[in-house]
Amino acid sequence: EGVQRFLKITSFLEKADKFHGAVSHFIDGTTGKTVAFFGPKDNGGDLVETSFLFQGLLTARQYFDQENDKEKQIRRSIDSLWKNVEWSWYKQFKDSPYLYWHWSPDQAWVINHKLIGWNETMITYMLAIMGPKYGISPEMYYSGWASQEEYAQEYRADWGRVEDGKMYTNGNTYYGENLKVGVSNGGPLFFIHYSYLGLDPHKFTDKYTNYFENNQKMAKINQRYCIENQGGYVGYGEDCWGLTASDFAWNYQAQEPMPHRDNGTMAPTGALASFPYTPDASMKALRNYYRNHGSFLWGEYGFRDAFNLTVNLSLIHISEP
């Protein structure tokens, strides 16, 4: 059954709209056509979402290793999709030190969003460097993702609203944890989740830090911020923590452990996806969410996307078209 389902997935992806090998953020599940959910400019390739897709496909490929026709076809399909992603196209111009998030077939680089860490896009640079046909130079890891040029510093300082970490490196101590890399005190927890679904942070060390250790510190900082609970929000504590991206009462926001980015909304995925970093603290959150709040937080498909006990609200989904 798993093999048949995966053949259906790869067959669909082969026929879906692609833009220099990259897929769009949202795809119509019936037709494979692009859904410009975020507006008319969002009608082309999304390199970051493409990288999330491919870390999953490449990981799954390792499991389908039998020499039967169906599993061979899965491997061939994934190989073809993978080899035809034109990572280097998304540099925008030949000597660019950065990758760019979007490209539109009729509006080109109108969104013009450079990929600069620290955020969820590390996996994009890693896969682009490994690209078998259209790869980028490994030097772009430091010139793009970990850039320390003035533009990158301004970008980080702007979204973080602090100077901490604007150089990509940080070095400050928060709640007893010395953070080597990251803007502010780490940001929303999906930064330490998304890129590491296919990339093992234990085994990845650059000239600044080991990323399992650095990510673990971010998870601990997030929990301790919630224990301190500067905003006085209902429920926060050692078993209710994990600020990250989610829907909330008024829209969508990437919640993070800073007062100006925290409105009392908690997403179960924050603590639960941090199990590899904080197994004991994550288990406390899991038990609390299920045993004490399961009546409204647990549904047919598991935990709901987010809840806010201060305003008595639970939410079902995130970024659903």
Region annotations inferred by a language model:
Residues 1-319:
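Ser/Thr/Asn(+Pro)-rich, low-complexity disordered segments
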